[in-house]
């Protein structure tokens, strides 16, 4: 309940400070696995989340939080970030650089709380968006680099499908996944409602007998989630 109140308080503060070039989102749903850097951090949990983006002159600043509600085993994950996209080749591709700091609060789940710093470079274009990202977790003493690609494709009747693939090399494991997300935005007078679903194939060689920051090893497992998002 305490973390739910924190989310509500955060949303209220974001709503008060929002203005032009800003948007706020609220979402709720369910996932069978919550993924952090290619490994499972929670299993079979409903979730709620809030987020806000403010576009400033030199960067987009964003803040968000997700609560995985599971009684005494709840978790929360909080991210503060900033990013900037610049045009590299007009009408061909651009470059976007993001830096983030994320706090992982595992509650009583048995996974240590930790703080993670990340950076991501993407090359958005009309065909496919490749990216490379890296992170360092100061509490888990883990660093890793991930490379991937994704593409958002409009479909008939307002649907958008986004396939993606990613491979990562972390100090104590490797991870790979291929996933597909489907959304259908509905514009209303007070915001955009977006139902969303996603499913993916995940594999890694994480050793749960040696390390305690994931719940299991993936061996070609299917990970899925679904929910509803409101953006205003």
Question: Where do the PLM segments sit?
Answer:
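Cleavable N-terminal export/targeting peptides
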Residues: 1-25, 231-232
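Short loop/turn motifs that connect adjacent beta-strands in outer-membrane beta-barrel proteins
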Residues: 18-23, 55-60, 87-96, 109, ...
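Short glycine/proline- and aromatic-enriched beta-strand/turn motifs that initiate or cap beta-hairpins
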Residues: 18-70
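Residues that define the transmembrane beta-barrel architecture of outer-membrane proteins
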Residues: 22, 42-48, 74-78, 111-117, ...
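Membrane-embedded beta-strand positions of outer-membrane beta-barrel proteins
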Residues: 26-28, 61-65, 97-101, 119, ...
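Transmembrane beta-strands of outer-membrane beta-barrel pores
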Residues: 30-36, 56-58, 65-71, 86, ...
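Outer membrane beta-barrel transmembrane domains
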Residues: 157-212
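Outer-membrane beta-barrel "beta-signal"
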Residues: 180-182, 186, 218-232
């Amino acid at each position: 309940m305490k973390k739910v109140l924190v989310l509500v308080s955060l949303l209220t503060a974001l709503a008060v400070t929002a203005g032009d070039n800003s948007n706020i989102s609220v979402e709720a749903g369910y996932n069978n696995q919550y993924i952090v850097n290619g490994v499972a951090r929670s299993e079979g949990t409903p979730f709620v989340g809030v987020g806000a983006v403010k576009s400033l002159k030199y960067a987009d600043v964003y803040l968000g939080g997700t609560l995985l509600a599971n009684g005494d085993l709840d978790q929360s994950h909080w991210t503060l970030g900033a990013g900037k996209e610049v045009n590299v080749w007009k009408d061909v591709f651009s470059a976007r650089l993001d830096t983030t700091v994320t706090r992982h609060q595992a509650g009583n789940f048995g996974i240590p709380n930790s703080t993670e710093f990340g950076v991501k470079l993407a090359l958005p274009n009309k065909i496919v968006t490749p990216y490379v990202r890296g992170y360092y977790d100061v509490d888990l003493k883990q660093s890793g680099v991930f490379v991937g690609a994704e593409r958002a494709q409009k479909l008939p009747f307002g649907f958008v499908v986004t396939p993606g693939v990613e491979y990562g090399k972390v100090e104590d494991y490797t991870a790979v996944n291929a996933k597909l997300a489907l959304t259908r935005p509905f514009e209303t007078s007070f915001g955009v409602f977006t139902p969303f679903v996603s499913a993916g194939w995940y594999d890694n060689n994480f050793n749960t007998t040696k390390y305690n920051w994931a719940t299991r090893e993936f061996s070609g497992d299917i990970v899925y989630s679904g929910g509803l998002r409101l953006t205003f």
